[in-house]
Design a protein with these regions (language model features):
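AMP-dependent adenylate-forming
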Residues: 22-30, 46-69
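Conserved AMP-binding/adenylate-forming core of the ANL superfamily
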Residues: 37-40, 57-102, 106-110, 127-132
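ANL superfamily adenylate-forming
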Residues: 65, 148-193, 208, 220
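Conserved AMP-binding A3 loop
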Residues: 69-71, 197-225, 231-235
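Conserved pre-ATP/AMP-binding loop-to-beta segment of ANL
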Residues: 183-201, 208, 244-253
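Gly/Ser/Thr-rich phosphate-binding loop
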Residues: 204, 275, 297-305, 314-376, ...
Length: 405
């Protein structure tokens, strides 16, 4: 294991040195705080989403009987952004989304952020009063939602309500009608790296849900860091003589089986796929039997959810009726996976198990482990994701603990 760790560190140093893809530099952010950032780095998430144009007509979003390419997705997003601008939405304004997973969630998400507004994904499991609280707390001017969420908001004034086309209702303007005839190209807006991009709500340990602001810099840094550790791990496996498919493999795809209002859904499954050109197969809600069918039909290579979901796949009565050999990773987060489950997953799927630890406040990044490292140490949460992440473990008096304590 020590040789493997030494090789990991060696490759990390190679990939982050001057002139390489993940070269870093030390600077001060807009508030004067010292930070480390990637040298090769989009100025904002609008520039990050433009990377999707490089994937062109390649399939990006699959939802039920619909299929959208990267270009079609970004065209829809641009139309939504332009419609918001015509409605008076300006840089820094908050626009909420509250609905089950569907492509219009992603169109809206990209469009909101690309015009410099702040995207506020709300928990679609909330009741009306909880949604109203978050709308008021975030000072949202617009909400895009489905009928179940919008029907409880009739008394909310000064809030434009747009209904997803997947649950049409004559009392609300539909997403398709709202974006119709608007340009598919967005004009450039001055957006700085440290400008706010999103507000996600966490359950909070006490009291009401807490709104977590994230910047363009923070979100892009997470995506680049995940790409960095993926390339390090792939290169390490290759040098050790093992086969490993890189994250940039053009045939990779991921099953989006968790809500987009959670960073596991939006960041791990959706946003990361923009960078690497990965196909995203969307589920409106979790169903293990349906997931098995989709994995087989769409040749899904990656699944990331809570550990319970992969456990349900393993124990589903239809598992052996379908070809699931396309799976390369069965990752989890949001809680620990029982140690005894790790080997069972590894023994019963061709894909390798993995686990990660992160927070809404960190854009889901923190630690990560997969493959042999995980199987041999199934109680671990993994290594710190390089090269930007730092983790300290403190005691109750805020003193940093020594290693092993």
């Amino acid at each position: 294991m020590s040789n493997s760790n030494n090789l990991f560190d060696q490759i990390k140093d190679e990939f982050t040195r001057e002139g390489e893809m993940f070269e870093t530099r030390n600077i001060r952010d807009d508030k004067g705080f010292p930070i480390t950032e990637y040298v090769s780095f989009p100025d904002n998430l609008k520039g990050y989403f433009d990377i999707g144009r490089l994937h062109g007509d390649k399939e990006f979003l699959i939802y039920e009987n619909e299929r959208f390419s990267f270009n079609q997705t970004l065209d829809n997003a641009a139309q939504f952004g332009n419609a918001l601008i015509l409605d008076g939405i300006q840089k820094g304004d908050r626009v909420a989304i509250c609905m089950q997973n569907n492509p219009e969630f992603i169109f809206a998400y990209i469009g909101i952020i690309s015009i410099g507004a702040v995207c506020v994904p709300l928990n679609s499991w909330w009741v009306a009063d909880e949604i109203k609280y978050a709308l008021e707390h975030s000072d949202a001017k617009v909400i895009v939602g489905d009928i179940k969420r919008l029907q409880g908001l009739e008394d909310v004034k000064d809030l434009k309500k747009i209904i997803t086309s997947y649950t049409p209702n004559d009392n609300f303007v539909s997403f398709k009608d709202y974006v119709k005839d608007h340009p598919k190209i967005l004009n450039e807006v001055e957006i700085k790296r440290d400008d706010n991009a999103t507000i996600y709500y966490t359950s909070g340990s006490t009291g009401k849900p807490k709104g977590v602001l994230s910047s363009h810099r923070g979100i892009i840094s997470t995506m680049f860091s995940w790409a960095c550790i993926s390339k390090i791990l792939t290169e390490r496996e290759n040098r050790l003589g093992n086969d490993a498919a890189p994250l940039t493999d053009p045939d990779l795809s991921i099953l989006l089986c968790v809500p987009l209002f959670h960073v596991t859904g939006s960041h791990v499954a959706f946003l990361m796929s923009v960078l690497v050109g990965r196909k995203v197969v969307m589920m409106k809600k979790w169903d293990a039997g349906e997931a098995i069918k989709l994995i087989s039909e769409e040749k899904i290579s990656d699944i990331t959810g809570v550990p319970t979901q992969t456990w349900e796949l393993l124990n589903h009565p239809d598992k052996d009726k379908y070809d699931l050999s396309s799976l390369k990773t069965l990752a989890g987060g949001g809680g620990p996976r029982p140690a005894e489950h790790v080997k069972m997953l590894d023994d019963n799927f061709e894909g390798r198990p993995g686990i990660g630890y992160g927070l809404t406040e960190t854009n889901a990044i923190g630690t990560l482990v997969t493959g042999d490292d995980y199987v041999s140490n199934p109680s671990t949460a993994g290594r710190v994701v390089p090269p930007l992440t730092e983790i300290k473990i403190l005691d109750e008096n805020w003193n940093e603990l020594e290693e092993g304590k």
